[in-house]
Every structure is written in structure tokens, then in C-alpha cells.
């Protein structure tokens, strides 16, 4: 690849050595490279590689081609495992001079773990990596998360690392989308944890669980990351607030991954009811980012409305699917997907 990837210097070195002499010992090559490339921190990088390989070997985890760190959060990328890997990199950093090339190389190699941990924060299910805290009754973002996100952005910038993947999704867009997600995370969402009922059927992703829409975990930039998917059909879902409640604003996010036929909906309609039978429209939000050949490959859009003097128990969201990929798309006429996450009601 022309773009940086995890430990790409090491992998290039090992492949080149083995091409010249296939009889060389694989583990010896790894140790030799790490000791020279990372200085006194090299042994901790070697230990990291050994530990993560061991964890993968000990599970039935299947690594998808277009996978996401969230798929490994119950196995080799569990919160405790990620914490252990992070500590090894921090030990490596502590063993070399701050101004040395060794330090810069270790920081650069560490961003894969930083990325996985940032995605773990989104899930908001681990005490080791909490997304938010309450401070003096005010909901705030975990300061450690903010520091890690800033460091991730800085290291990528300093090393001219511009892409998150081979599909053209940029680091700049990733950080921007993440910051937008943090803005959502600190909202006082009265729909959080409330029961969601689906009137159309989802498919395959997020275990087809409607509660994904109100579970407090934020969808990332991959459709494997906490998004509820609908293939070729609209999304119709309603949430029960348990009692008549005053509401002032509503929003929900949708994902776009154009090369995988995942598009934003045509529009999103919000409705309210007191009895689940008679629904009144609160408003319809049109897609501001119409699909075209120059659309971002990977993007997240928030559909939101503000309302006044509305008291209700049930809130419904209807998202209109494009149904099929357009004629100019490589998947022309195939069913298109919409992916939704986190209904926010304030």
C-alpha cells in the first residue's frame, strides 16, 4: 500500500528478508528489527506483537476484510487487553529519549491502539474507557478521551498520515466526525435506554437489535460499529418515553459508505403520538447531502428538528431509503442500505 498501516515498516522488513531467505526465523526477524528500529523500547513492541497474536489465536474471532475494531471488543481487543497493549507502548516510550527518532517511531506505531481505544470509548460500556462523566451535575466528556483524540490527530499530522483506510476516508474527517459525536454524547437524552419498537425489519448488523438506537453507544464510521441497517426498505421505529413528556428537539444520525451501497436517506420524518395509533407529524428533514459521483465515500449526517410546546409519550422516526443504487454507481439497481444510530430527544 502507498499509505501507512500498522507496523508497516516491520512487515516490509520481514517480507523482504524472507523473500531472500525463507529459512530465516520469523520471531528472530521481528526481534532484530524492533530492537534496532525502536531502540530500548523495542522489546515492548515485540511483547505487544506476541500478546496480541496470542489473544487472536486463543479466540474464534474472524477478521473481516472491512472489519472494525468493535468486532474485537469481546476478544483480542477487549478493554483489558487494550489497556495492557497501551501500557506496553507507554513503557516503550519511557525507555527512549523524548527528542529521539525512537520516540517518534513508537508514537507513530502506537496510533493503531489509540484508534481502537477511541472506538471503544464510543461504545461506552467499559469502566476502563468511559465516554462521559458527571461533574457537579454536569455531563462532560472524559478528559482522557479528549487528550487521546488530540494526540491521535497530532501524531497523524506530524507523520503525514492522511487516510484512515484505502477508500479515501481522511483522518481530518474522522476527527471531525468524532468531535461531532462528542457533542451528541453530552446531550441530556430523555430517550436513552427507552424501549424502541420497529415497524420495518432491519438486517444483519447490530444483531438487528432496535435498542441500538437508544443504548448510549455512538455509531462510528464503519457499518459494523453500532449501526442498525435496513436494506432496500425504509426505517420506521418509535420510542416509548414511558409517560407524557415535554420535548424540544429531536435528532438521529445516519451513515454513508458509498462504495458499499450505504447512502443517506432521502428524508427523515419525526412524528408524535399519545396512543401509538394516531400520529402527528412534527416535521420532515430533507437530506442536505444529495448523493452524486463526488459524494464523500464515508460520512455521517445528523437529521434534526426543534419543536415548541410539544408534550407526548411516543416519538416515531421514518427514514426514506433510496431503495436502489443509482445508474452511475458500480452497484446500480442493487438494494441500497440506510444505517441509523442514536435517537436523541431533549
Predicted feature locations:
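Short loop/turn segments at secondary-structure transitions that flank enzyme active sites
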Residues: 2-3, 202, 276, 323
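Short secondary-structure boundary/capping segments
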Residues: 9-16, 267, 286-287, 298
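Aromatic, loop-rich ligand-recognition surfaces of beta-strand-rich domains
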Residues: 218-283, 299-346
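Solvent-exposed serine/threonine-rich low-complexity stretches and specific carbohydrate-binding patches
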Residues: 282-292
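Predominantly extracellular/luminal regions of secreted and cell-surface proteins
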Residues: 185-218
Amino acid at each position: 500500500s502507498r499509505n501507512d498501516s500498522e507496523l508497516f515498516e516491520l512487515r516490509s522488513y520481514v517480507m523482504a528478508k524472507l523473500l531472500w531467505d525463507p529459512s530465516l526465523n520469523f520471531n528472530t526477524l521481528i526481534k532484530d528489527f524492533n530492537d534496532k528500529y525502536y531502540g530500548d523500547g523495542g522489546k515492548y513492541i515485540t511483547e505487544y506483537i506476541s500478546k496480541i497474536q496470542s489473544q487472536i489465536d486463543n479466540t474464534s474471532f474472524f477478521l473481516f476484510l472491512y472489519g472494525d475494531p468493535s468486532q474485537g471488543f469481546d476478544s483480542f481487543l477487549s478493554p483489558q487487553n487494550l489497556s495492557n497493549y497501551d501500557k506496553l507502548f507507554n513503557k516503550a516510550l519511557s525507555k527512549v529519549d523524548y527528542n529521539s527518532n525512537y520516540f517518534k517511531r513508537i508514537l507513530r506505531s502506537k496510533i493503531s491502539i489509540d484508534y481502537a481505544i477511541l472506538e471503544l470509548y464510543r461504545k461506552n460500556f467499559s469502566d476502563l474507557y468511559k465516554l462521559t462523566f458527571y461533574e457537579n451535575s454536569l455531563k462532560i466528556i472524559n478528559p482522557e478521551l479528549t487528550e487521546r483524540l488530540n494526540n491521535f490527530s497530532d501524531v497523524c499530522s506530524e507523520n503525514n498520515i492522511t487516510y484512515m483506510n484505502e477508500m479515501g476516508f481522511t483522518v481530518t474527517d474522522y476527527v471531525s466526525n468524532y468531535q461531532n459525536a462528542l457533542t451528541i454524547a453530552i446531550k441530556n437524552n430523555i430517550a436513552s435506554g427507552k424501549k424502541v419498537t420497529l415497524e420495518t425489519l432491519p438486517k444483519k448488523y447490530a444483531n438487528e437489535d432496535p435498542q441500538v438506537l437508544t443504548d448510549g453507544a455512538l455509531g462510528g464510521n464503519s457499518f459494523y460499529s453500532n449501526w442498525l441497517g435496513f436494506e432496500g426498505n425504509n426505517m420506521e421505529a418509535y420510542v416509548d418515553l414511558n409517560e407524557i413528556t415535554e420535548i424540544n428537539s429531536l435528532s438521529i444520525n445516519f451513515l454513508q459508505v458509498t462504495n458499499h451501497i450505504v447512502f443517506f436517506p432521502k428524508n427523515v420524518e419525526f412524528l408524535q403520538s399519545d396512543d401509538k395509533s394516531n400520529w402527528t407529524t412534527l416535521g420532515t428533514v430533507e437530506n442536505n447531502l444529495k448523493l452524486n459521483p463526488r459524494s464523500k465515500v464515508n460520512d455521517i449526517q445528523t437529521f434534526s428538528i426543534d419543536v415548541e410546546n410539544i408534550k407526548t409519550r411516543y416519538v416515531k422516526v421514518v427514514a426514506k431509503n433510496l431503495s436502489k443504487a443509482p445508474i452511475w454507481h458500480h452497484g446500480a439497481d442493487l438494494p441500497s442500505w440506510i444505517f441509523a444510530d442514536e435517537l436523541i430527544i431533549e
